[in-house]
Amino acid sequence: VTGESGLFADPFYSPGSDFISMSNTWTADLIQRDLKGEDIFFRTKFYTEVNKALYDNWMPIYINQYPLWGKTQVMVAKIFWDWGAYWSINTLLFTNNGLTDLELLKKLTAGPRSILQKYGELSTNMQRLFSDWGPLDTADLTERYTDPFDLDFLKQFQEDIVEKEFNRDELIAKFEENMVILEHIAAETFRLVSNKVHGTSMELTVDPYTMSLNGEDRKSKNSKEVLRDAHIAKEMRNMWLYPYPEKVMN
């Protein structure tokens, strides 16, 4: 959980203070429980496993992604995705005291189709998409500005962590709801990129867990086909700097 045996994030965007705060939260909780005479063996082991799972799920946003700096459209899409994923899962868990709620953590991590497993797999596949797209994003897109809060779903993710509190059942329901939104964001991002690179239809049905810009054959226990969502599609126009495909949803 902490110290030399702990985990630390690459400072791609920041110095990793989020993982420091998570580590401090677990450490403080364990110390308090130990001082009260509680047996903390299982809790310590479980916190360690959750810490590693969150770390492994999050590291793909950094690994081998430095070449994407300077790729304007890729980095806009990537930063918006990274923020959305972070706010809707990681931060929401922290701000609702979920890191020390064993029952909640068990429900989020149990099984290959658990929320945390799906989240990690989806996030990793999105980072593959950004990596594959990077060398193809060569346009000089200057004098453009896009605000993340022009996208309603990012605004909602932020409001959920700043203005609201959830009990355990509400939090699980919110995670499930957010995962569906993330799946649609991932699928719509792929449609935009694939249309730009390969000229494919914007009405393409996409599996966000197995999608590949290079046509790689990928398998997933969480595989699902995602149809186009009108609201998500409309919102994502605000982050697309290239000319938008002619046939779009109204």
Can you annotate each of these PLM segments?
Residues 7, 26-99, 104:
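Active-site-proximal substrate-binding core of FAD-dependent oxidoreductases
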Residues 1-13, 17:
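Short FAD-binding loop at a beta-strand-to-alpha-helix junction that anchors the flavin cofactor
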Residues 3, 7, 52, 56, ...:
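Alpha-helical context
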Residues 13-28:
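A short alpha/beta connector and helix-capping loop motif
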Residues 75-250:
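C-terminal lid/capping helical subdomain adjacent to the catalytic/cofactor pocket in oxidative enzymes
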